[in-house]
Amino acid sequence: MEKVKIEEIQSTAKKQRIATHTHIKGLGLEPTGIPIKLAAGFVGQLEAREAAGLVVDMIKQKKMAGKALLLAGPPGTGKTALALGISQELGSKVPFCPMVGSEVYSSEVKKTEVLMENFRRAIGLRIKETKEVYEGEVTELSPEETESLTGGYGKSISHVVITLKTVKGTKHLKLDPTIYDALIKEKVAVGDVIYIEANSGAVKRVGRSDAFATEFDLEAEEYVPLPKGEVHKKKEIVQDVTLQDLDAANARPQGGQDILSLMGQMMKPRKTEITDKLRQEINKVVNRYIDEGVAELVPGVLFIDEVHMLDMECFSYLNRALESSLSPIVIFATNRGVCNVRGTDMPSPHGVPIDLLDRLVIIRTQIYDPSEMIQIIAIRAQVEELTVDEECLVLLGEIGQRTSLRHAVQLLSPASIVAKMNGRDNICKADIEEVTSLYLDAKSSAKLLHEQQEKYIS
């Protein structure tokens, strides 16, 4: 009997690059808020995750706006992962703006301006708008022409007659000639499902009606069902924007059509500051929208990693910004112990001034034990689609304890290439030993430098 050929279809979707925290999918908590030992890509750090879970609940209930949080712990203990877990738990509707302390230093823009931009990027505004729309399948589309007013043989379109059909009924519409241009731009034809906004005259082609799904067409069409309800309906449209989007839109109005404006648009614009006056005007409009019930403020999260990189000016600015009416939840992270505040001789815990530390609640992250390190390395191997045996994981756990977790995880990719060169799919102990002899960790390199100090230029 002839063998039936069955082929698997490979997905054409783009594969995302595997980053350091790709495996983090949330905080891994039960509905009661109790952390699960191994869940959502997280291993251990039970107290820190439980504390972060309470923060997420407070953010969702809008009880934590203007408050700040500090994630403190040694390097490689999951501070950034914890912040990312918080953002995953909050979902895509709550703005999450990550930045690094060193980002504030720019030759063009003041430090405080960079901080303010990120503050406003972390505050969302949900605008609800009721729009009148005509929606349905196009059954007739005929432009009506008249003699051109300028004379000659040319003709101009006076109006467009269009018939839209839904499940409930049909409507004949007489549209303005400007809408005809929008119909041509969207390539609307009979059998397409479209919707037209009554106020602006904007036309959106949703797709082809599924009644035509049996047609053979070279171009891949998106087939959509016939719209339900009446042709003329009111739709509530919700838009999510950030305050920084509003600032940027109003700070750079579109230029005219003259040659100077066009040249100015083509040239690379220099990054300029948005004035306080403009921000205050936008705040007034936002407050009016909130009072009218048109918009709703969504305080998001601003995550500042390596907070010890900020100086006294930034910290004094943060003190004031945290107490303003429009302030997001700010999460700081640092791996410093007692050190000088940048630009001063004043020692302070975590490199943060005492007056700002008073305003923070601090979450500690603990160093991972060997069994937790082995579990993390196993999760990373799974994410990177690598096969690692048990003996190899134990060795990587020992390397992680001796050097750092990051170094142990970084050895996985080169070890997989060594395994493939040796004709194996799975990584074994010999591959890890070979890679370890090739690549030094920070402690080994420092020890070597100390031993061969006289051979280096100091």
UniProtKB/Swiss-Prot annotation:
Q: Which GO terms describe its biological process?
A: cell differentiation; flower development; meristem development; regulation of defense response to fungus
At the highest ranks, the source species' classification is: Eukaryota, Viridiplantae, Streptophyta, Embryophyta, Tracheophyta
Write down the chemical reaction(s) this protein catalyses.
ATP + H2O = ADP + phosphate + H(+)
Knocked-out gene: effects? Gametophyte lethality.
Would you tell me the protein name for this molecule? Answer: RuvB-like protein 1
Q: How does it assemble?
A: Interacts with FRI, and with FLX and FES1, two component of the transcription activator complex FRI-C. Interacts with the disease resistance genes RPM1 and RPP5.
Q: What functional role does this protein have?
A: Proposed core component of the chromatin remodeling INO80 complex which is involved in transcriptional regulation, DNA replication and probably DNA repair. Component of the NuA4 histone acetyltransferase complex which is involved in transcriptional activation of select genes principally by acetylation of nucleosomal histones H4 and H2A. Has single-stranded DNA-stimulated ATPase and ATP-dependent DNA helicase (3' to 5') activity suggesting a role in nuclear processes such as recombination and transcription.
Q: Does the keyword Cell membrane apply?
A: no
Question: Pfam families annotated for this entry?
Answer: TIP49, TIP49_C
**Family to which the UniProt record says this protein belongs:** Belongs to the RuvB family.
Q: Name one GO cellular component term.
A: nucleolus
Compartments it resides in: Nucleus
Q: What is the gene called?
A: RIN1
User: Is ATP-binding among the key words of this record?
Assistant: yes
